[in-house]
């Protein structure tokens, strides 16, 4: 078997998220069916992490183990798979990697981008791709609020619970590091970018929702800073942005040089 690392882009609107579920309407399920059809046998893939229903990706990473009988040049893999995939899922990159590489456990961080539309009337082509917030709010305050998340914090207030957390929850379980943040406006769109070493369930959407509440003047920057820097055990931010505007842009890995590697444009 030969291990291959793939990068995938997908429109999350038709799917119930990344992770396989009964019924098969997830990105992972669709990809696994494409691999199994190509290999003639069941194939499991392993992603860098989950994306929720309606969340998009331009840089999701997963790995698969291909039979040695199917070793082809890396730049041939995207075409071989894309012909078996719906137009809402594309393989954009493939490379052979050492057997110890793991899409999830080898990752060192991720970058997410959230899109907000300020248009008075939402462009139909933004439906499901941007959060429509046409009422008055301050991009400057939004930027200040977003930058408060930089650094290492206990993100208790900005994490939803899946129900499968360890009990009791260990100390430091909600601690994460946000290394970079950015807010940029292009026309009627505002883009918020977070890069971090790891993200909790719904963390980006909860951070975005809280920052937007500050931009609307519904909470102060001081109140937001307290939730970030000194959360109480039961603190939970109630402001969760919808999945529509969220895109996984990139999964980060240590600098490595793999063998047969080519960027697919």
Curated annotation (Swiss-Prot):
EC number assigned by the record: 5.4.99.12
Alphabetically ordered keywords of this record: Isomerase, tRNA processing
MF terms in GO: RNA binding; tRNA pseudouridine(38-40) synthase activity
Keyword Cell inner membrane among record annotations: no
UniProt KW tRNA processing keyword: yes
Subunit structure, interactors included: Homodimer.
Task performed by this protein: Formation of pseudouridine at positions 38, 39 and 40 in the anticodon stem and loop of transfer RNAs.
Annotated protein name in UniProt: tRNA pseudouridine synthase A
Family note: Belongs to the tRNA pseudouridine synthase TruA family.
Source taxon at top rank: Bacteria
Gene Ontology process terms (BP): tRNA pseudouridine synthesis
CDD domains: PseudoU_synth_EcTruA
Annotated binding of substrate, by residue: 112
Reactions performed catalytically: uridine(38/39/40) in tRNA = pseudouridine(38/39/40) in tRNA
Active site: 52 (nucleophile)
Top-level enzyme category: isomerase
């Amino acid at each position: 078997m030969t291990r291959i690392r793939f990068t995938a882009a997908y429109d999350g609107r038709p799917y119930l998220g990344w992770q396989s579920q009964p019924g098969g309407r997830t990105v992972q399920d669709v990809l696994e069916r494409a691999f199994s059809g190509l290999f003639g046998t069941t194939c499991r893939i392993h992603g860098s992490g989950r994306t929720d229903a309606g969340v998009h990706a331009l840089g999701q990473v997963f790995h698969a183990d291909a039979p040695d009988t199917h070793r082809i040049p890396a730049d041939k893999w995207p075409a071989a798979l894309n012909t078996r995939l719906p137009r809402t899922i594309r393989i954009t990159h493939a490379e052979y990697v050492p057997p110890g590489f793991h899409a999830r456990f080898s990752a060192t961080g991720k970058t997410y981008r959230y899109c907000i539309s300020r248009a008075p009337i939402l462009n139909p082509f933004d439906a499901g791709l941007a959060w429509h917030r046409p009422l008055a709010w301050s991009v400057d305050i939004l930027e200040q609020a977003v930058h408060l998340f930089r650094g290492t914090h206990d993100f208790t207030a900005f994490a939803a619970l899946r129900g499968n957390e360890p009990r009791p929850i260990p100390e430091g379980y909600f601690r994460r590091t946000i290394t970079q943040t950015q807010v940029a406006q292009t026309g009627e769109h505002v883009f918020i970018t977070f890069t971090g070493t790891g993200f909790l369930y719904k963390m980006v959407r909860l951070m975005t929702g809280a920052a937007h509440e500050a931009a609307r003047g519904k909470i102060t920057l001081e109140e937001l800073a307290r939730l970030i820097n000194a959360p109480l055990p039961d603190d939970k931010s109630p402001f969760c942005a919808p999945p529509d505007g969220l895109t996984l842009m990139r999964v980060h890995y240590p600098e490595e040089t793999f063998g047969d590697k080519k960027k697919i444009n």
